[in-house]
């Protein structure tokens, strides 16, 4: 008889422990007085007598923060590893040829040449025909020291002052 009584007592004690551990006691204010209610252990109290099922992992903000940081780190590391293993091909740009000669210094301090400054052929004489400044400005340089494609020098209008404001307004 002592044996079944001990088993019954252990069973009742186990049920009592399970009932008290498996419930959360929650409360909220309704007006001036608190209202009490009970939720299960895997549910959260949400306020007005409702219990919300939630996994504990959803409440761990630092877990999700570290998970996202890990994903970003892996993506970044993968990007840099891919860039190192498969580098982009180097694009060889053609060399830009800017060979020109300057005007010779003026022989006399009072004598100046007429016309804008010009670019000359490195292999030929430097002449400035006053009437044909555009032809001289766009002259192609055949004896380029680099041997690549040659480009004409920039036009000579870069060194002239802009037109006055009144003239621009009058033209429109």
Swiss-Prot record:
Record region (Disordered): 139-172
- Bias class Pro residues marks the residues at 151-165
- Those parts of the protein on the Cytoplasmic side are 82-172
Which regions span the lipid bilayer? 61-81
The cellular location(s) given in this protein's UniProt record come to: Cytoplasmic vesicle membrane; Late endosome membrane; Lysosome membrane
- Main location as per UniProt: membrane
Q: Which InterPro entries match?
A: VOPP1
User: Could you list which ranges are Extracellular topological domains?
Assistant: 23-60
Give a short account of what the protein does. Increases the transcriptional activity of NFKB1 by facilitating its nuclear translocation, DNA-binding and associated apoptotic response, when overexpressed. May sequester WWOX in lysosomal vesicles and thereby regulate WWOX role as tumor suppressor.
Mind telling me which PANTHER family this protein's record contains? VESICULAR, OVEREXPRESSED IN CANCER, PROSURVIVAL PROTEIN 1 (PTHR14971:SF2)
Name of protein: WW domain binding protein VOPP1
- This protein's species is Rattus norvegicus (Rat)
């Amino acid at each position: 008889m002592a044996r079944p009584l001990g088993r019954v007592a252990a069973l009742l004690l186990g049920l009592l422990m399970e009932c008290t551990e498996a419930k959360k006691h929650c409360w909220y204010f309704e007006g001036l007085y608190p209202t009490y209610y009970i939720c299960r252990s895997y549910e959260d109290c949400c306020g007005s007598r409702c219990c919300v099922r939630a996994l504990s992992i959803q409440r761990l903000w630092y877990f999700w923060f570290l998970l996202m940081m890990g994903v970003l780190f892996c993506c970044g590391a993968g990007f840099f590893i891919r860039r190192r293993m498969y580098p982009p091909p180097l694009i060889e740009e053609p060399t830009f040829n800017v060979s020109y000669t300057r005007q010779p210094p003026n022989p006399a301090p009072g004598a100046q040449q007429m016309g804008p400054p010009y670019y000359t052929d490195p292999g030929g004489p430097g002449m400035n025909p006053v009437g044909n400044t555009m032809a001289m400005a766009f002259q192609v340089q055949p004896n380029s020291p680099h041997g690549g494609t040659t480009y004409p020098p920039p036009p000579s209008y870069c060194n002239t002052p802009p037109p006055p404001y009144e003239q621009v307004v009058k033209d429109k």
